């Protein structure tokens, strides 16, 4: 899979809002995350080739624990077929990577993200109270959140699938991550994220909530998730996060 800029689930404008409106602790967590995001976006080092599986459709997962550091991938804590180690973030990452892989294989006969059998790797407990999750072109990375604004980033299958779907877009469309091209990139990931959640829940489109990030907002935050695809602009309205700014129609965007 080619080198790519990291794709983050929490955009910089939300982090800046927390820096402006949050408590001192919330501001610190958001600023640390924002600084990290800006650093990674400014410098994308080359990466070694990711491992692949030779049998079409065969699922292979590796889950690592970053130990609240920013060293990737971390310590391996679960591999394909290994039982749970009791860490909920590890189990969620393992399960949701698997469900996303199954969705693309069973629905589209797509052999992992790149259609060449890419092994799925995820690292949990990244950074200290890190308020984001991202796909770095080779693997998934999940922060734990701060527990005040965001819960752990493995909690929402649509977020996991959203980020993994950037790997599909990278290998197929090559959409430049800028302005409308970048918006299309994000939109495709939102669609696939919601479809994977529907696949997991065995829902039809009319029964789905079309919320991206269900469960991600911590208790006390006024919102259902990060975005609503059925009612854009209504996902959250909170004193710290502000109001969901997503337009419902193109005329509201231009």
Predicted regions: what is each one?
Residues 1-158, 167-254:
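Zymogen propeptides/activation segments of proteases
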């Amino acid at each position: 899979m080619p080198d790519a800029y990291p794709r983050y689930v929490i955009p910089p404008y939300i982090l800046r809002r927390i820096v402006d409106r949050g408590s001192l602790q919330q501001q610190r967590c958001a600023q640390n995350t924002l600084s990290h995001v800006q650093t990674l976006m400014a410098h994308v080092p080359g990466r070694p080739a990711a491992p692949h599986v030779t049998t079409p459709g065969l699922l292979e997962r590796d889950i690592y624990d970053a130990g609240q550091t920013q060293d990737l991938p971390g310590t391996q804590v679960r591999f394909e077929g290994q039982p749970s180690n009791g860490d909920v973030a590890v189990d969620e990452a393992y399960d949701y990577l698997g469900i996303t892989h199954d969705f693309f294989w069973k629905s589209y006969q797509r052999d992992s993200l790149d259609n060449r059998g890419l092994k799925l790797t995820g690292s949990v407990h990244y950074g200290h109270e890190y308020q984001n999750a991202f796909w770095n072109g080779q693997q998934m990375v999940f922060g734990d959140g701060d527990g005040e604004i965001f819960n752990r980033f493995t909690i929402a299958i649509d977020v996991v699938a959203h980020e993994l779907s950037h790997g599909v877009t990278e290998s197929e469309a090559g959409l430049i991550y800028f302005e409308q091209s970048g918006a299309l990139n994000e939109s495709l990931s939102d669609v696939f994220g919601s479809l994977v959640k529907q696949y997991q829940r065995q829902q039809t489109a009319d029964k789905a909530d079309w919320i991206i990030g269900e469960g991600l907002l911590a208790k006390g935050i006024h919102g259902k998730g990060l975005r609503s695809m059925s009612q854009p602009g209504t996902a959250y309205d909170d004193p710290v996060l502000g109001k969901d700014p997503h337009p419902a129609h193109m005329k509201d965007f231009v």
